Amino acid sequence: RDDVESRGLGDVYKRQDISPVNASMLTIVAAMAVQEAIHKVLTEDGHDAECRIKWPNDIVLNKKKVCGILTEMSAEMDYIHYVVIGMGINVNTTEFDDSIKATASSLYLETGDHLKRSRIVAAFSESFAKYYDTFVKTQNLAGLKEDYNSMLVNKGGDVKAIYADKEIVGKALGINDEGELIIKTDEGEKIIRT
């Protein structure tokens, strides 16, 4: 790829014309790439583990969180200086504090296999490039939402969200073109933003 520079620890994507309003969607693009990378590596190793995305940016394996993603950006009204996407993937962690071990896990604890991080990084880079290209073309998630929704752990299931100091209970329908979660409630559809 001619729009990527390798720096040894990760890929540095050269500047694209992304509006600051759309940059937060890169977190969802990264979540898709991490989910696909973990799924690919585990499948290649013969594991049938359920790896999904918990909206908007957590990766869960067998319903336990194995990865969190954060995005940091420096921008002006119409110009992005930089976007940094950070991911913490629990690859070979062997134990967790009692306070989180019911909800957090690692690829090792879920599969019993020590995995090479380099395989996950390589699979992530390949997946991110694919999803990033689609995102840059549309400047939203229109071309990715079908794939994202198929990766969503609670799509069609009951969810509870706190939004604007109100509890919203309903069924998760998936995301829209902006990455907002659509929840069907008794009062109609509600849009949840991050």
What are these regions (language model features)?
Residues D2-Y13:
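Single conserved hydrophobic/aromatic residue that forms the stacking wall/gate
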